Amino acid sequence: MAPKNNAKGGDKKGKGKDASEGDKGKGGGKGLKPATSINVRHILCEKFSKKEEALEKLRNGAKFDDVAREYSEDKARQGGSLGWKVRGSLNADFEKAAYELEPSTTANPKYVEVKTGFGYHIIMVEGRK
């Protein structure tokens, strides 16, 4: 199957990678320097259908923290912010996915989906150190 490319005339308007390049949901962590801690946000949904609704909002350009406030069942008031987390302090599957993400902003998030015993997570990273 050919890769998705929904670009409209190749207009990038000075932005980095966008959803039309198929990168937004993948994180693209290749070449990242090792980090001992990350500043992470997530949207936690118990139900698959609710997670899909949240993803659709993100794909349509909504800010990550706004979607977290509306859909997340954890840390919703903080826009999904978990703060700075060191290696070993998070669920193993969640942590593996989060540490592979490139940092991004809530206005133009790079995110990844993970299912854990807690439910469905949509994760983004704001910083690494």
Curated annotation (Swiss-Prot):
SUPFAM superfamilies tied to this protein: FKBP-like (SSF54534)
Annotated keywords: Isomerase, Rotamase
Residue ranges, compositional bias (Basic and acidic residues): 9-26
Any one GO molecular function term: peptidyl-prolyl cis-trans isomerase activity
EC number: 5.2.1.8
Domain spans labelled PpiC: 35-127
Family: Belongs to the PpiC/parvulin rotamase family. PIN4 subfamily.
Lineage: Eukaryota, Fungi, Dikarya, Ascomycota, Pezizomycotina
Catalytic class of the enzyme: isomerase
Pfam families reported in the protein's UniProt record: Rotamase_3
Protein name, UniProt field: Peptidyl-prolyl cis-trans isomerase pin4
A biological process from GO: rRNA processing
GO CC annotation: nucleus
Catalytic reactions on record: [protein]-peptidylproline (omega=180) = [protein]-peptidylproline (omega=0)
Function noted in UniProt: PPIases accelerate the folding of proteins. It catalyzes the cis-trans isomerization of proline imidic peptide bonds in oligopeptides.
Annotated region described as Disordered, given as residue ranges: 1-34
Species: Aspergillus fumigatus (strain ATCC MYA-4609 / CBS 101355 / FGSC A1100 / Af293)
